[in-house]
């Protein structure tokens, strides 16, 4: 078991998900996976994860030997987020990656063979749209015509904002979403480069400490039941390594059970793989974890994506789920 330094610069701007996927479709046809074995169990597996509080279960499973106990030789790699991790998955750099479901659906809709093998986190109070304390914005409809910082242009954050604005009677098409890494959004907000920002723990707690305020929770009302992110692999890897997939999913579920509601564990663990202090972790809103894939939630996400133009037409997500 090991953790490998970050492969992608989380502070640099990245191209939109669709552009990255288009490049993958052209460049990686026929590529294999990193650790697959034809006998149904991978000799070793590479896992790409974004370093957040939300990915504590996968790190915990590695650090405590849960993966090893399940027969998996795991190597963890940090990524710059799901939209950037998916091309690396298809290119064979990883066997499993953590991604938001919007990026996963976009990939599948454009023909990439990605499948969801496990859930991870569900929308809760750990996500929020935030503004400065002296902001003139006071309700969701006020974002009409505003500039909002998000960590990826085609992501669950922009999708949820669009759904909430529509529910409030505003036009989400008039929101200007700007792509920025989470750690620099606060400075951009203070400098007036953006009017509001999407923050997720532990950055939400840090923003509150800096004096910023929650304009509205991101997952409420029309977005209250949305799953946020989970774990995907390629169809080839899932078909060729069913034992590895089952072991990964079962181990993640065990780890979620151990991590869930154990703040002391998180206070000790999260600072080891993020730049977040134990003091901040002690104050964060706890994520809501669920390792089970959510077919209905994924379908609802795809329906919203079609409504707001993230995909061109209705998309059946049934074949995206690889679960018992």
For the regions a language model picked out, list residue spans one by one.
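Short, solvent-exposed loop/beta-turn-alpha elements that line the ligand-binding surface or hinge
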Residues: 69, 220-224, 288-297, 317
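Short, glycine-/small- and polar/acidic-enriched structural segments
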Residues: 39-168, 179, 195-199, 214-218, ...
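Bacterial lipoprotein signal-peptidase II cleavage site
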Residues: 28-42
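Conserved C-terminal helix/tail region of periplasmic/extracytoplasmic solute-binding proteins
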Residues: 305-324
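Solvent-exposed, polar/charged alpha-helical surfaces in well-ordered, non-transmembrane soluble domains
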Residues: 56-60, 64-65, 87, 91, ...
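Sec-dependent bacterial lipoprotein signal peptides
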Residues: 1-29
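Pocket-lining segment of extracytoplasmic ligand-binding domains
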Residues: 102, 178, 183-268
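Secondary-structure end/capping motifs
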Residues: 239-310
């Amino acid at each position: 078991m090991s953790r490998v330094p970050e492969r992608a610069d989380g502070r640099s701007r990245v191209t939109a998900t669709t552009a990255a996927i288009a490049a993958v479709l052209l460049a990686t046809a026929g590529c294999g996976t990193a650790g697959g074995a034809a006998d149904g169990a991978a000799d070793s597996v590479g896992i790409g994860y974004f370093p957040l509080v939300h990915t504590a279960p996968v790190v915990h499973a590695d650090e405590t030997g849960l993966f090893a106990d399940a027969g998996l030789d795991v190597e963890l790699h940090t990524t710059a987020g799901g939209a950037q991790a998916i091309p690396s998955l298809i290119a064979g750099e990883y066997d499993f990656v953590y991604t938001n479901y919007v990026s996963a659906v976009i990939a599948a809709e454009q023909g990439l063979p990605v499948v969801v093998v496990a859930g991870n986190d569900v929308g809760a109070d750990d996500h929020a749209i935030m503004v400065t304390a002296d902001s003139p914005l006071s309700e969701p409809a006020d974002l009409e015509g505003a500039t909002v910082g998000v960590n990826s242009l085609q992501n669950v954050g922009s999708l949820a904002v669009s759904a909430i604005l529509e529910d409030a009677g505003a036009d989400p098409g008039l929101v200007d979403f700007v792509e920025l890494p989470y750690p620099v959004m606060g400075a951009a907000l203070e400098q007036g480069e953006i009017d509001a920002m999407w923050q997720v723990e532990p950055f939400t707690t840090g923003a509150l400490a800096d004096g910023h305020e929650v304009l509205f929770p991101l997952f409420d009302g029309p977005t209250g039941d949305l799953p946020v992110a989970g774990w995907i692999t390629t169809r080839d890897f899932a078909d060729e390594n069913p034992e590895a997939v089952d072991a990964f999913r079962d181990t993640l579920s065990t780890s979620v059970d151990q991590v869930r509601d154990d703040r002391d564990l998180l206070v000790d663990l999260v600072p080891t793989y993020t730049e977040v202090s134990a003091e901040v972790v002690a104050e964060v809103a706890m994520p809501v974890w669920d390792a089970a894939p959510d077919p209905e939630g994924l379908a609802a996400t795809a329906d919203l994506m079609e409504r707001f133009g993230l995909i061109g037409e209705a998309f059946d997500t049934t074949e995206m789920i690889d679960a018992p």
